[in-house]
């Protein structure tokens, strides 16, 4: 996938895919991710997260054994169903993605971002393959499903999408925690660096997994998202 005249150059197709992927999963892409903490706000108030070390432990678990892995599996399955034009399979994945969200606020978080992502991406990067995939999903669309079908429509390599998606996910979690703990910029980047060895294998597991492999072992994080709904003072919507 490189230019034959320069072994270090990107092919035109790969350069376009990389450009789109970096744009879609950039913090500046307007899906409203900054407004959500995925329950971290309650975890900070409860004392579960109080510094960079405890944040790293919490996010490592969320990535490998919780929302990160599950979202990765859903993204991959939606991507494959959309690529194959399997509308029934895509609808089943989309329905499951919304049904398995553990709390009302997390459901709002993923469906609001999913709707924003697919609307903006489809207007800025139109594709004849997108409208049928959107229609197949039915009503509400979870964020990883939206990323999966848009990436499939533009033939962005799935492995790269998964890695970039999980990096964006954990980056947003860290951004929220930095405002809540609070953490300085250097500590925030140390946490991101510490999670690098977690992102890659989680993406690889999600790539190889089926829907039967979905499951979470982060009950405390799920409980945090539930308890956030009645938290008295809040900065975030989840």
Curated annotation (Swiss-Prot):
InterPro entries: UreF, UreF_sf. The keyword Chaperone applies. Its main location: cytoplasm. It is found in: Cytoplasm. One of its GO terms (cellular component) is cytoplasm. One of its GO terms (molecular function) is nickel cation binding. Pfam families: UreF. Keywords: Chaperone, Cytoplasm, Nickel insertion. Signal peptide: none annotated. Belongs to the UreF family. Required for maturation of urease via the functional incorporation of the urease nickel metallocenter. UreD, UreF and UreG form a complex that acts as a GTP-hydrolysis-dependent molecular chaperone, activating the urease apoprotein by helping to assemble the nickel containing metallocenter of UreC. The UreE protein probably delivers the nickel. This is Urease accessory protein UreF.
